[in-house]
Amino acid sequence: MTTIIVPTDLSQVADNAARYAAQMVKGIYDVNFVLYHVYENDEDKESANILMDRLKEELQSRHMIKVQIKMEEGGDLIENVEKQARYFDAQLIVMGITGKTGKSKLEQVFMGSNTLKMIEKNVCPVLVVPSTAQYFEIKNVCLLSDFKDVETSMPEVPIKNVLNLFRPALHIVNVNSEHYVSLTPEFMAERGRLLEKFKEYRPEFYFIGTFDLVETAQTFVADKNIDMLITVPRNHSFFGSLFKTSNTKKLISESTIPILAAHE
């Protein structure tokens, strides 16, 4: 049984993420799909119940899935979601994020920070769905890897749990300005380890010698018709580094396709 938790504040961005997730698992019968909401008080609970029931009925009727509603009063959203993910032994959390346009700066920061905090919790992979993303069949997935300590840092099982939902073609990409005509022995060894881990997907490898990770990833996504991007954040100071450096933050905020963050 695959459990997916979709936290929602009942905003358009969160509803879009829920619809994306429901479409993604349409027709998969062993999925436990949990809509989760935190309300502030009894008055808020009454209106939230109506909206949650409405969203549940929409998702079930359109996508032929069984949806479970879980609601709680107050508390920290991220801590609550983490608790629910551990309780349900979730394999995936799906959250929406606001892009650079269309929303206020305050809303961008708030929604972005909640999503990134959830990634930092490292309870299970988090699928970040852009506010404008529409679901299309997931045929091509790109895994970005730094090819360092693959044996210990690559979260093979959590990534496979998600990939097995749709069995896509897997493209494994490394961006490094020091790549020349041939790979170093170190890169060849790490390539072999990645191939062994993901051999059932028959991955294709790409070593791109450029400086700009974000621009290169965006170009690759467009050229190869990539439907989902996978990143593997490092444990050390992930949340802080996202806001102090530009690469991962830009990658998430500017992406037009979902990004799966699976912690090492």
What are these model-derived regions, one by one?
Residues 83-132:
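Hydrophobic alpha-helical segments and helix pairs
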Residues 80-88, 216-224:
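Short, well-structured alpha-helical segments in soluble
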